[in-house]
Amino acid sequence: MDNHAAVREFDEERATAAIRELLIAVGEDPDREGLLETPARVARAYKETFAGLHEDPTTVLEKTFSEGHEELVLVREIPIYSMCEHHLVPFFGVAHIGYIPGKSGKVTGLSKLARLADMFAKRPQVQERLTSQIADALVEKLDAQAVAVVIEAEHLCMAMRGIRKPGAVTTTSAVRGGFKNNAASRAEVFSLIRGH
């Protein structure tokens, strides 16, 4: 499930030195007043931004409740922030996460869905994989009979470089189980995600 399991711990000292070298490489003076603390600040920011590399996101789904609930659970408009692994610039937007509990009726706390998305997002990432990882975790840990995850995000690698199209939104979806196999159920959950 999580292909980042063997990642080494964050090396803040090494990251600070690397940022200092990057400033030199782009033609800046890392010893000028405005940049003196920048390497350490950026290293601390990256430590937080990539914290998901050092966590197993599926652990947030270990606490469940046997509610006997057999219908859709959907949380919409969950803000997400991640870093494009190709350019190491942010992408950000919203995730919509829905599932129908399995036969056991196990549900998780609503905040756990947002936490799951955050933990998978806090690593070098691509939106397509992020979407699938969230869906697969719900199937694996909750034994959900149907899962739908939709992410809508703006990628700064498209907005501030290359094609330069700010405001362009990329939408990805991952459907599992009943939502994948039943067109009517899939259409219903996508309609609810759109808010109609």
Curated annotation (Swiss-Prot):
<dbReference type="InterPro" id="IPR001474">
    <property type="entry name" value="GTP_CycHdrlase_I"/>
</dbReference>
<dbReference type="GO" id="GO:0005525">
    <property type="term" value="F:GTP binding"/>
</dbReference>
<feature type="binding site">
    <location>
        <position position="157"/>
    </location>
    <ligand>
        <name>Zn(2+)</name>
    </ligand>
</feature>
<keyword id="KW-0378">Hydrolase</keyword>
<dbReference type="GO" id="GO:0005737">
    <property type="term" value="C:cytoplasm"/>
</dbReference>
<dbReference type="GO" id="GO:0046654">
    <property type="term" value="P:tetrahydrofolate biosynthetic process"/>
</dbReference>
<comment type="pathway">
    <text>Cofactor biosynthesis; 7,8-dihydroneopterin triphosphate biosynthesis; 7,8-dihydroneopterin triphosphate from GTP: step 1/1.</text>
</comment>
<comment type="subunit">
    <text>Toroid-shaped homodecamer, composed of two pentamers of five dimers.</text>
</comment>
<protein>
    <recommendedName>
        <fullName>GTP cyclohydrolase 1</fullName>
        <ecNumber>3.5.4.16</ecNumber>
    </recommendedName>
</protein>
<keyword id="KW-0342">GTP-binding</keyword>
<keyword id="KW-0547">Nucleotide-binding</keyword>
<dbReference type="Pfam" id="PF01227">
    <property type="entry name" value="GTP_cyclohydroI"/>
</dbReference>
<dbReference type="GO" id="GO:0003934">
    <property type="term" value="F:GTP cyclohydrolase I activity"/>
</dbReference>
<keyword id="KW-0862">Zinc</keyword>
<dbReference type="GO" id="GO:0006730">
    <property type="term" value="P:one-carbon metabolic process"/>
</dbReference>
<feature type="binding site">
    <location>
        <position position="84"/>
    </location>
    <ligand>
        <name>Zn(2+)</name>
    </ligand>
</feature>
<dbReference type="GO" id="GO:0008270">
    <property type="term" value="F:zinc ion binding"/>
</dbReference>
<keyword id="KW-0479">Metal-binding</keyword>
<dbReference type="InterPro" id="IPR020602">
    <property type="entry name" value="GTP_CycHdrlase_I_dom"/>
</dbReference>
<comment type="similarity">
    <text>Belongs to the GTP cyclohydrolase I family.</text>
</comment>
<dbReference type="InterPro" id="IPR043133">
    <property type="entry name" value="GTP-CH-I_C/QueF"/>
</dbReference>
<feature type="binding site">
    <location>
        <position position="87"/>
    </location>
    <ligand>
        <name>Zn(2+)</name>
    </ligand>
</feature>
<keyword id="KW-0554">One-carbon metabolism</keyword>
<dbReference type="InterPro" id="IPR018234">
    <property type="entry name" value="GTP_CycHdrlase_I_CS"/>
</dbReference>
<dbReference type="GO" id="GO:0006729">
    <property type="term" value="P:tetrahydrobiopterin biosynthetic process"/>
</dbReference>
<dbReference type="InterPro" id="IPR043134">
    <property type="entry name" value="GTP-CH-I_N"/>
</dbReference>
